[in-house]
């Protein structure tokens, strides 16, 4: 049976850059908040003491997040500047198309359209500076809203979002495919879709 710490760690991992609140952790795991505080402190200490771990646990704006340690910033930057990450996969393009057409949109909104979890795709697009955070939705948990950036426009040779074809609301039986088709028409992308 998995330990409480393992459960917490898995939720921190899957919540990605958005992070997770103490209330959300408590609701999902059934662990009371005082016990969660204790487990989170232990987990933070574990990462801090373990020199072989690349991660650290941070607490900001009522949310807990797993992030890479500052000492690895140059290595991460080197990877991000390599050709390996600049080519967008089908899953990344799909996520980007949804954000481009539906912005501002939450990660959960993207997940619902894609039908799969999108945390890693959103993190990747943020690292590429193609999308950015744009406030929070006034709803329980105050989820982060995402929008495209000026770099997104430059990347695809667009002058403004107005150059994206308009959605035909009457024909949107498969919203995800319509968004991808329109996005590919505009950007000239023909990459095969792939699952995250």
UniProtKB/Swiss-Prot annotation:
Its main location: cytoplasm. GO terms for cellular component: cytoplasm. It holds the Pfam family SMC_ScpB. One of its GO terms (biological process) is cell division. The keyword Secreted does not apply. Gene3D superfamilies: Winged helix-like DNA-binding domain superfamily/Winged helix DNA-binding domain. Keywords: Cell cycle, Cell division, Chromosome partition, Cytoplasm. It is found in: Cytoplasm. Transmembrane segments: none annotated. Belongs to the ScpB family. Participates in chromosomal partition during cell division. May act via the formation of a condensin-like complex containing Smc and ScpA that pull DNA away from mid-cell into both cell halves. Homodimer. Homodimerization may be required to stabilize the binding of ScpA to the Smc head domains. Component of a cohesin-like complex composed of ScpA, ScpB and the Smc homodimer, in which ScpA and ScpB bind to the head domain of Smc. The presence of the three proteins is required for the association of the complex with DNA. PANTHER family: SEGREGATION AND CONDENSATION PROTEIN B. This is Segregation and condensation protein B. It comes from Ligilactobacillus salivarius (strain UCC118). The lineage of its organism: Bacteria, Bacillati, Bacillota, Bacilli, Lactobacillales. The gene is scpB.
